[in-house]
Structure formats: structure tokens, C-alpha cells
């Protein structure tokens, strides 16, 4: 049996002992604190690689396994390229799930949270993610949320945090308000799934709209580095629209209503005005016309059904600014009070929603466009749409009946939450109800222990019931604390900066460290955060830039979104009973097998169906890697004498790794490693394991494999007799001669008879060709015990060994 086949049989019959490797190397890596960055190293170039931090809702799941596999792949890649890599870890540990679990089980949300953090931390360490654990943070630690409060006060000082009474999104299940970004298109809560209703409450907002243009314009800085769909989602969410605000007089109010439109050319098709159910003008008109009770009842029912074409005749009229005609005014369920002034000039002849509403309420439908030209539009008839748009706008502005405006879909960020487990808002109120910011020296405003607090959602903040905490006597006066807590997306809007100075107690981070490490070079996480976390982080970064705390305008230079891990095509969930348990899979298959199999399954952005993930194939490959490393001698001849064909394959892979990583084609690298191993094993059969090209190939595989399966790679590296650790090894430099030069087939003879062939470079030297020919196992065997009288060498075509007769 050939040696190669024997080795293959051995590998397939051997169990891949992943547990032994994990038990061997995990404590060594932890002991040596292998992945802590050297802050004193000012010479080595730096990279900051970050995974979106985890919420501690239980043990890790397969979604975590996928995300951390990709993030760790990139961090290890940059280390192998000679960079000092910051790759920190932490937990987004405030939030509703902990509070709801505490209510359900009668426990403390703090205890529940930190128990889950400990469990996840153990799993993360086993998973061999190369984190710098010295920078670990939890957003529920006072040492962290102190700086949440500091940041809030900075925003308040600059007029970007304010409190007002407004219609807000109310989650009736979690009994707290939601930001617009947390309400799904179907009107349900992004977290609880409950139908969201509207409530009028006094709440805290952040003026993100002040940054709308910059948030939109600076997306151009991220093109080709962020997924296009994320950029598109943010662009659409910000929703910049250029148009005209047109004045419609309402005689019963004795004042006009301003209506924003992007299509002023349709003004002659207006047959009614539609107002938002919850606007003040709507209530005022309903009250004057005696239909306020109907409005309130209808609004309440609409909140429950989310019906899109319900309305109410307000029995009032507006005056058309150009024709002078009276136009009926309706309250309409499809009009948003917080967008474009909460009023729409309705053109049912050219808008499908307006048309449905007009049909339902028997309102006129007028066509004013035909073949892209205006009709029935007075002096503007016959003009093209573009001409009429400009001319009507100009005339309205000239008559002071309109003005050019830019409107945004983006609304200010509502951050008040009527729940316990979050950052207290650092504001006091005096006896007159005036707002007084807490002094920075008095931070943090500590969250009181939950013992004795009724956490059951009531619509009121649980903190309001702790009178000793709420009421504060200071300088002879009585003050009352704000009892709401902050949206936890505030916590995550700047956490990547706290990693730079996690132990600093004089500032959240320093400008020096921000300049040194920021911004994040590579960010890894799910697309579900496109218009939540990612937008908020961009806003806060721009604010910090404005006040001189960072010197960059965007937080994350590059972004990779991974797909979901599904089972039989369905999203995993506890309710469906189709959860694949992380700990069970790791126990059964091992970390390295899972990591390699996940990455090999396809491009990161695509969903992975767990049933299609090949554990057996991954385990077989890793076993062969270790067994092949054992075949390679500790010392080999000069590399220049290595097999040319194998070196071409090795250097082709080395040459392609950079662009494959840059384009996130990690699965292609996995396939190339498997190919290189197969080629190497076949070469062992023909040229022997002691050929220096064999060692070069296996060392290259070990270094590259560290990005996938670090336990196996570290074991291979030790077997090969190299200096610990493989994670510090650099990729060999690419020898471009193997990429550019042509090869040819050289004939190897003994006494003029063909005994073998070699694939060699056309510029191979006589010495190299003779050495390579002698290294062929068939030639080595034939010349054993015989004296070579003469060597005839004609590079690159021929080597003939002339031997003494037996």
C-alpha cells in the first residue's frame, strides 16, 4: 500500500481528539494573556477589529458562533500581517429581557444578568476568540454608565437633549415607550411583537435631526466599505426630501396650515386636505365642529387595528391658495403627525393612498396630468411636469403662499424608558418643575438595588416608587430625580470608545487613545442594526467630533453583516423548538470543527442552514492537517531546492489571501487550504516528506488555519518544531517568481532510460535541477548503493545519471 493511502486510512480511522487540544491550549493562552495589545508599542501598525457586543440573555447561540468566527478570523489575519490588533469584548447588559426575566422568576435583574455574562464568558474563552480580556466591560456597571450620564449632560449642554410632551410609540406589552426605529413596518414592537399604540407623554429626546444632513452626506465616505443595503436603509430612513411648504388658510382657525409637498405641480388636483389623527390642529378643528368624541374613539380603535384608510370628516374647509376654492378637511389614519407637518394636500388622481381614501369617503378625483404634461391646471396647462414644478413653486413663493423647504423622515431619538434596568437620567427637578442637570462631580447617579421595588410594568417608572431615592435634599432645598431610564441603544452608541480606556476614571476615554486606535477598522454584526445602533453610533461620533473628543467623523470604517444560522430554512427560536444549542454542539464536535465548518459553508452575508453544515468533512480535514504535520521532518534542505510545482500552489494561495480577506471570501480560503493539503499529501508520495516545499506548504496551512481553527493550528505549529505561538507567526512573503515565470517538464533518466519527470521553472539552475531530480523517491531508490559516474544536465529539459554497472 502506498504511504499516502496508508496515511489517509490512518486519518479516517482516527478520532479527531478536539477535546485534548482544547484542554491543552486554552489554559496556556489564558495564562500567557496572548491577545492583550501592547500599548507601549508605537512602531507596529495598528488595527481595531470589533464584534457587536452580546446581550447576556443566556448562553451563546449559533448566531454568536458565526459572528465571532468571522470577527476572530479578521483579527487573527491582521496579526499574521504584522499588526498590533485591538480586539476587545464586552456585554450590552442593561435592558428589558433581564427585567422581564426577573419579574417572571421573582429574581434580581442584576443577578440574572451577571450570571448569564459569566456563562457566556466561559463559552467565549472556549470558543478561542482572540479577545483582549483586560478591556472587558459591562454597560450595567456604574463605572460604565457613569459615562452614559456624562455624555447625556454634554448633549444637554449643547442643546441636543431636550424634554417635551409628544405623541409617542407605546408598547402595551412591555409598557414602555419606543423610538420610531424600534417599531416595525407592520406597526409591532421590534422587541415584544405587540401592536404599538400612540400615547401623549413628556419624554426625553436627542436632537439627531440636527445631524440629518451630515448623517446622509457622510454615507458617501462608507461606500464600498459598508454593505450597500445598509447604506440604502440609512439613506431611506433619514429620508431627505426637497419640496415646498404651501399655505392653506382655514377660516375657522383664522390661521393657515402649512402643508409640505415634493410635488407642487399637483396642486390643481387637490380635492381634500388630510391631517394626522393626533395633531393639535386636528383636535382643534374637531372640537370646533363637535366631532372631538368621534375623533378620540376612532383614534383609539385605529391604534388597535392599524387600519390604513380610516378617516373622519372634520366638517371644516381650507382655501386653495391658487384657485380660492374651498377644500374639505379630513383626519386620516395614513398621515403621520411627526412627518412633513402632519398635513397632506391630497391628490387622489395621482396617488394610490389618496385615491383609496377618496373612494371610501366619496371625494372627487381629478386628473391633472397626461403624457407627462399638466392639464386642467390653469395657466400651467401644457407645461411639462418639470417646468410646472418650478413655475408653481416660484409663483407660490412670490405671493408669500409657500417657501422652499427640505424635510426629513428622520425623527428625534426618544430615549426615555419607563423601566428599571437601565441608566438613570441625570436630571433633577426643583419645586417649580425646572430641569437642573446633575453636577459631573456627583456622577454616577446610581441605580438603586431592586430589592423591594415592584418591577411589574405599570406604565410608570419603577424608580418613581423609591421615595428615598427620588427625593433629594440639597443646599436646603428639595429636588426630585427624573425617574425614567435611558434607551439601551444609548449605551451601545459609544461603547467602542470605552474599550480604548476601560479603566480611566477621569474621562470616558482620552483623545490620545482615540487618535491612536480610532476609528474601528472592521466592525462585524447583523444587518438588523442598520437604522438603530449603527445610525445612533454615527450620530454620537459626530457629536463627539464636534466637541473635540475624537478626531474622526465615522465610527466604523468597514462593516460586515453576517447572515442568520437557520435550521431547515426556518429561523431558530425557542417557541418553534428548533434551537441548536451552542454548548451541545461544541461538546459533540469541538470548537475548531464548528468554526471551520461555519466559515466553509458560504459567504458571510448568506444565511447558513445548520442541516447543511458538514461537521464530518471539517473534522476529517483537521485530522489530516495534524497527521500530515507529523510526517514533516523538523529540519529540511534549503527552500530554493524545494519542489517547484508545490511552491507555485503555496505562493498562489499566499498571493490571494489578501484580496480574499478584503472581499470577505473566507470560505474560498478554506477551500484553497483543503486543495493545498491534498496536493501536498500527493507530493509526499512522489517527492518525499523531507522536500523543503512540503514544510513550506504545511507551515502556510498552519498559519492560515489559525484564522479558522486555532487549536489545531497551534498543535500543528508545535509539531513542526516552531516557536510558540502560531498566532504570532507572519505569513511568508510571496515569491512572485512562482507567479510570473513559466514552467516546463524535465525528463529524469538513469543510463538514458526514463525514470521520472519533474515540473520545474524554465530558469532553473543546473544545481537545483540535479538536486530536485535526486530527491524523487523513484530516483533515490534506483541510485541507492550505486556509484554515479557522471551527471548530464541540460536545464530545464533533462537530467541523466550515468552509473557504474552493478
Swiss-Prot record:
**Gene Ontology cellular component?**
cytoplasm
Q: What is its EC number?
A: 6.1.1.4
Q: Where is this motif: 'HIGH' region?
A: 54-64
Give the UniProt keywords, A-Z: Aminoacyl-tRNA synthetase, ATP-binding, Cytoplasm, Ligase, Nucleotide-binding, Protein biosynthesis
CDD domains under this entry?
Answer: LeuRS_core
UniProt-listed PANTHER family: LEUCINE--TRNA LIGASE, MITOCHONDRIAL, LEUCYL-TRNA SYNTHETASE
Which Gene3D superfamilies would you find in this protein's record?
Answer: 3.10.20.590, HUPs, Isoleucyl-tRNA Synthetase, Domain 1
Which family does this protein fall into? Belongs to the class-I aminoacyl-tRNA synthetase family.
The processes (GO biological process) annotated in the record are:
leucyl-tRNA aminoacylation
Native source species: Tropheryma whipplei (strain TW08/27)
**Gene that encodes it:** leuS
GO MF entry, a single one: leucine-tRNA ligase activity
Q: What is the name of the protein in this document?
A: Leucine--tRNA ligase
Chemical reaction(s) catalysed: tRNA(Leu) + L-leucine + ATP = L-leucyl-tRNA(Leu) + AMP + diphosphate
Please give the Pfam families that the UniProt record associates with this protein: Anticodon_1, tRNA-synt_1, tRNA-synt_1_2, tRNA-synt_1g
Amino acid at each position: 500500500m502506498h504511504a499516502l493511502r496508508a496515511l489517509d486510512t490512518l486519518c479516517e480511522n482516527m478520532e479527531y481528539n478536539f477535546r485534548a487540544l482544547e484542554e491543552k491550549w486554552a489554559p496556556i493562552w489564558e495564562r500567557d494573556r496572548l491577545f492583550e495589545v501592547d500599548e507601549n508599542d508605537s512602531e507596529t501598525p495598528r488595527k481595531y477589529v470589533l464584534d457587536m457586543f452580546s446581550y447576556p440573555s443566556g448562553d451563546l447561540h449559533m448566531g454568536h458562533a458565526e459572528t465571532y468566527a468571522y470577527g476572530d478570523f479578521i483579527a487573527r489575519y491582521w496579526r499574521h500581517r504584522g499588526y498590533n490588533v485591538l480586539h476587545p469584548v464586552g456585554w450590552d447588559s442593561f435592558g428589558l429581557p433581564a427585567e422581564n426575566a426577573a419579574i417572571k422568576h421573582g429574581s434580581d435583574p442584576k443577578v440574572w444578568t451577571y450570571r448569564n455574562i459569566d456563562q457566556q464568558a466561559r463559552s467565549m474563552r472556549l470558543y478561542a476568540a482572540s479577545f483582549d480580556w483586560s478591556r472587558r466591560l459591562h454597560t450595567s456597571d456604574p463605572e460604565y454608565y457613569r459615562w452614559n450620564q456624562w455624555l447625556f449632560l454634554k448633549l444637554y449642554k449643547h442643546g441636543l437633549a431636550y424634554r417635551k410632551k409628544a405623541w409617542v410609540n407605546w408598547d402595551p406589552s412591555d409598557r414602555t415607550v419606543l423610538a420610531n426605529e424600534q417599531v416595525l413596518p407592520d406597526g409591532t414592537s421590534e422587541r415584544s411583537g405587540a401592536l404599538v399604540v400612540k400615547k401623549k407623554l413628556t419624554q426625553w429626546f436627542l436632537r439627531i435631526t440636527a445631524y440629518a444632513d451630515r448623517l446622509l452626506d457622510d454615507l458617501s465616505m462608507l461606500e464600498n466599505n459598508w454593505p450597500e443595503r445598509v447604506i440604502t436603509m440609512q439613506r431611506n430612513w433619514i429620508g431627505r426630501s426637497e419640496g415646498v411648504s404651501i399655505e392653506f388658510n382655514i377660516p375657522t382657525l383664522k390661521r393657515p396650515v402649512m402643508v409640505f409637498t415634493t410635488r407642487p405641480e399637483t396642486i390643481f388636483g387637490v380635492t381634500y386636505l388630510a391631517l394626522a389623527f393626533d395633531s393639535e390642529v386636528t383636535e382643534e378643528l374637531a372640537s370646533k365642529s363637535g366631532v372631538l368624541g368621534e375623533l378620540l374613539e376612532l383614534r383609539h380603535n385605529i391604534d388597535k387595528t392599524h387600519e390604513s384608510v380610516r378617516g373622519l370628516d372634520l366638517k371644516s374647509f381650507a382655501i386653495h391658495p391658487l384657485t380660492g376654492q374651498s377644500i374639505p378637511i379630513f383626519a386620516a389614519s395614513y398621515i403621520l403627525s411627526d412627518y412633513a407637518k402632519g398635513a397632506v394636500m391630497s391628490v387622489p388622481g395621482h396617488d394610490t393612498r389618496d385615491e383609496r381614501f377618496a373612494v371610501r369617503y366619496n371625494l372627487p378625483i381629478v386628473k391633472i396630468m397626461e403624457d407627462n404634461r399638466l392639464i386642467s391646471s390653469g395657466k400651467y396647462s401644457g407645461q411639462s411636469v418639470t417646468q410646472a414644478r418650478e413655475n408653481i413653486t416660484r409663483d407660490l413663493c412670490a405671493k408669500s403662499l409657500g417657501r422652499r423647504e427640505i424635510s426629513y423622515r428622520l425623527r428625534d431619538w426618544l430615549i426615555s424608558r419607563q423601566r428599571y434596568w437601565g441608566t438613570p437620567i441625570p436630571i433633577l427637578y426643583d419645586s417649580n418643575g425646572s430641569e437642573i442637570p446633575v453636577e459631573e462631580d456627583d456622577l454616577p447617579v446610581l441605580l438603586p438595588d431592586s430589592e423591594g421595588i415592584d418591577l411589574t410594568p405599570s406604565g410608570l417608572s419603577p424608580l418613581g416608587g423609591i421615595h428615598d431615592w427620588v427625593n433629594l435634599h440639597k443646599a436646603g432645598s428639595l429636588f426630585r430625580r427624573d425617574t425614567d431610564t435611558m434607551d439601551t441603544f444609548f449605551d451601545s452608541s459609544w461603547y467602542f470608545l470605552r474599550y480604548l480606556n476601560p479603566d480611566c476614571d477621569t474621562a470616558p476615554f482620552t483623545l490620545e487613545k482615540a487618535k491612536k486606535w480610532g476609528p474601528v477598522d472592521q466592525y462585524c454584526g447583523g444587518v438588523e442594526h442598520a437604522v438603530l445602533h449603527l445610525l445612533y453610533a454615527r450620530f454620537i461620533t459626530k457629536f463627539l467630533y464636534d466637541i473635540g473628543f475624537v478626531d474622526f467623523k465615522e465610527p466604523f470604517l468597514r462593516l460586515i453583516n453576517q447572515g442568520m444560522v437557520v435550521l431547515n430554512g426556518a429561523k431558530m427560536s425557542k417557541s418553534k423548538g428548533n434551537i441548536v444549542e451552542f454548548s451541545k454542539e461544541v461538546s459533540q464536535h469541538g470548537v475548531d470543527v464548528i468554526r471551520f465548518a461555519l466559515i466553509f459553508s458560504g459567504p458571510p452575508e448568506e444565511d447558513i442552514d445548520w442541516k447543511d453544515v458538514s461537521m464530518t468533512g471539517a473534522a476529517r480535514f483537521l485530522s489530516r492537517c495534524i497527521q500530515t504535520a507529523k510526517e514533516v521532518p523538523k529540519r529540511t534542505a534549503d527552500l530554493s531546492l524545494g519542489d517547484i510545482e508545490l511552491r507555485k500552489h503555496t505562493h498562489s494561495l499566499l498571493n490571494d489571501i489578501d484580496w480574499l480577506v478584503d472581499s470577505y471570501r473566507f470560505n474560498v480560503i478554506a477551500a484553497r487550504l483543503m486543495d493545498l493539503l491534498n496536493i501536498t499529501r500527493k507530493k509526499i508520495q512522489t517527492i518525499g516528506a523531507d522536500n523543503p516545499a512540503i514544510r513550506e506548504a504545511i507551515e502556510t496551512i498552519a498559519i492560515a488555519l489559525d484564522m479558522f481553527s486555532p487549536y489545531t493550528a497551534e498543535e500543528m505549529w508545535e509539531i513542526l518544531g516552531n516557536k510558540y505561538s502560531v498566532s504570532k507567526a507572519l505569513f511568508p512573503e510571496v515569491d512572485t517568481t512562482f507567479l510570473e515565470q513559466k514552467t516546463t517538464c524535465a525528463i529524469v533518466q538513469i543510463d538514458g532510460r526514463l525514470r521520472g519527470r519533474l515540473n520545474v521553472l524554465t530558469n532553473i539552475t543546473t544545481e537545483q535541477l540535479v538536486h530536485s531530480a535526486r530527491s524523487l523517491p523513484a530516483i533515490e531508490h534506483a541510485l541507492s548503493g550505486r556509484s554515479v559516474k557522471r551527471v548530464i544536465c541540460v536545464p530545464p529539459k533533462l537530467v541523466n545519471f550515468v552509473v557504474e554497472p552493478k
